[in-house]
């Protein structure tokens, strides 16, 4: 995750313009035609599917901070203009390529895509689609890929959280933060201390399963955690804020504690004081979920299928904070940038 975006630096046009509805005979898509400018809604001509590809009728699409950064030219991946943002979606299969064997027409699926999903149709490789069980809604399924894929790898694959351990989660009211709380509490039976920047967000985190909450805008996070966890500290910290919050989380760890870095929503990247790692035998590690798609697809795919399995079994409860129509895409971006969002923000294509 890159640095926090300051809305005071936005072009005024972002704050007042609606997406433009184009005319045509094909399907609608949100297009970034110029960096740092509002997206437009235009009619797009469909292209043929390749042998391994699947065309999906998109019902819901997740709105992620990475989409916003990409539309400003600030993301590590820089798709050529014009492009359609959107990395995760749910929908129904419309058409399959000649060599597709994993899904068939009519199947309900979730999928991941490299900036194609904010459209009424999306074409993606068959291996990046997973079928949705009958008892899971398309809306709940759309929440799973980025947030719960990340949460599952953070909690299990990286931190290896054990039942009864105490876990500190920062940025706990965001989509990924709530997913970490959900997985850690309801699947791994850990005790969660949720850290957020407001009392309202603290309340939401507790409602969603955290045992305790801390508003780190009102004082020392380390002192507050010490009162809740005791002098020994927490076993695991999962940080998405960076800067001073990361450092206080690190200092809140117990002997042989583990800290997992998921991002830098606060805009600052802290230097790790390695003496603390030595003195407490602490393990510090990072997690970039999307990278597993290219480096270790088996791990990536398992995180998706596991999220779906947990949802099917009723172990986890995906939380949607807001839903916008496709033509309100610029409002959805502002909602995220101005830190109004809690939980997953979705676009509805229906």
Swiss-Prot record:
InterPro entries the record matches: ADH-like_C, ADH-like_N, GroES-like_sf, NAD(P)-bd_dom_sf, PKS_ER, Zn-ADH-like_protein
Any GO CC annotation of this UniProt entry: mitochondrion
Stored Pfam families: ADH_N (PF08240), ADH_zinc_N (PF00107)
Membrane in keyword set: no
Keyword annotations: Acetylation, Oxidoreductase
Modified residues (N6-succinyllysine): 201
Name assigned to this protein: Quinone oxidoreductase-like protein 2
Taxonomic source organism: Mus musculus (Mouse)
């Amino acid at each position: 995750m890159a640095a926090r975006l300051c809305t005071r630096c936005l072009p005024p046009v972002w704050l007042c313009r609606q997406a433009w509805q184009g005319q045509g005979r094909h399907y609608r898509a949100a297009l970034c035609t110029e960096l740092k400018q509002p997206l437009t809604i235009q009619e797009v001509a469909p292209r043929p599917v390749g042998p391994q590809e699947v065309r999906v009728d998109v019902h819901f699409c997740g709105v992620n901070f990475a989409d916003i950064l990409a539309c400003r030219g600030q993301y590590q991946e820089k798709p050529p203009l014009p492009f359609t943002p959107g990395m995760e979606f749910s929908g129904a299969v419309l058409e399959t390529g000649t060599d597709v064997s994993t899904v068939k027409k009519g199947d309900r699926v979730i999928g991941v895509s490299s900036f194609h999903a904010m459209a009424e149709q999306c074409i993606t490789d068959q291996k990046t689609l997973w079928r949705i069980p009958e008892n899971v809604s398309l809306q709940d399924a759309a929440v799973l890929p980025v947030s719960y894929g990340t949460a599952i790898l953070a909690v299990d694959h990286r931190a290896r959280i054990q039942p009864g351990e105490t876990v500190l989660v920062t940025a706990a009211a965001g989509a990924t933060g709530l997913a970490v709380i959900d997985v850690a509490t309801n699947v791994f039976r850990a005790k969660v201390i949720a850290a957020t920047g407001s009392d309202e967000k603290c309340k939401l985190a507790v409602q969603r399963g955290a045992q305790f909450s801390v508003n780190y805008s009102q004082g020392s996070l380390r002192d507050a955690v010490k009162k809740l966890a005791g002098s020994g500290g927490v076993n695991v910290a999962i940080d998405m804020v960076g800067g001073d919050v990361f450092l206080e989380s690190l200092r809140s760890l117990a002997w042989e504690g583990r800290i997992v870095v998921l991002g830098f929503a606060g805009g600052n990247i802290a230097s790790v004081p390695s003496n603390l790692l030595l003195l407490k035998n602490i393990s510090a590690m990072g997690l970039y979920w999307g990278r597993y798609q290219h480096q270790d697809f088996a791990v990536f795919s398992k995180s998706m299928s596991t999220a779906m399995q947990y949802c099917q079994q009723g172990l986890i409860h995906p939380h949607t904070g807001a839903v916008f129509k496709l033509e309100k895409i610029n409002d959805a971006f502002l909602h995220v940038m101005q830190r109004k969002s809690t939980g997953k923000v979705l676009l509805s294509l229906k």
